[in-house]
Amino acid sequence: MYKRQILYSDTLHYDTESKVATILGPSVIVSDSGTIHTSRGWYDTVNNTSLLLDQSQVESGEKILIGDSIFYNRDTGMGEVYGNMSLIDTAQHVTLQGEYGYYNEQTGYAFATDSARFLEYSQGDTLFLHADTLQMVTVDSVYREIKAYYGVRFYRIDMQGVCDSMQFNTRDSVLYMYTEPVLWNEQYQLYGDTIAIYMNDSTIEYAHVIQFAFAAQHVDSSYYNQL
């Protein structure tokens, strides 16, 4: 093992020829780049690669990667997850989930598919986003970009929406909804070719409907205002 890498374990088998440690009990692997918590799997101490099972956790800075099976390469920072993936950003208060996905620590790129979900809980209410495929790119310590594809649905107490694809960049705080988007905000419903939602401190400031705009306001049980 490298000087700055330590494996603490309840039970393990270590092959002195292959330099592979088979983990058979609660274990912690500590290095300069982060910490791994696992109870079953193996760790190649020469190539810094591992297979981590049973909802193991890979912690790197403010990110935590969790999954049923994680193929992890510490040198490249790549973690590929099969089953119950969660990528938690403790600084930005967001979580990316799916049945399959991966995360690259060095580029800040994350991908999730198969029941993919994104949760944003930095404010008082949580935003729930679901799509077939989700991508999250961490631009820097402050900004990130979210892309959602196919069957997009999102919900928060002050807004709900559906569309085919969506993009949100926290740098300009604009959420773009593409292909038959529908947005509900309290008693209002918006429809158009594309909807751009301008946010201010995670609340809707205004929405811009681009082409084929339709707006409806629910007045009471019998009346609607339409534009």
What would you call each of these model-derived segments?
Residues 3-227:
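Structural signature for solvent-exposed beta-strand/loop edge elements and short helix-capping sites
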